[in-house]
Amino acid sequence: MRKEHDSLGIQSVPQSAYYGIHTVRARGNFPAVSSVNDRELVKNFLRVKLACARANQKAGRWDDERVPLAIVKACQDLLAHFEEYEDEFAIPAIQGGAGTSTNMNVNEVVAKDR
């Protein structure tokens, strides 16, 4: 296990997990719920992040060009090999209507070095 911290405290995260503290917190909020978000929803989050990274790169909004390239590469890799990473997106389907936990989960997995 690795320890991660945020403004709410410290959580243990499995060492090999691509997700992080926000995902652990979201899963802990609904421990008895076994159904997770539909895989197509998660893939669409990845597609939106990919499109946003490209659009902002084209618009010159990044101070460091490595950032959008890393986001694009990660999103493409996750989409191309989704079955390998599907367990990393284990946010309970009942998590609140805003999708914040799903968004944070996807951000954590995209940001993780592969």
How would you label these PLM feature ranges?
Residues M1-R114:
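Conserved, well-structured ligand/cofactor-binding cores
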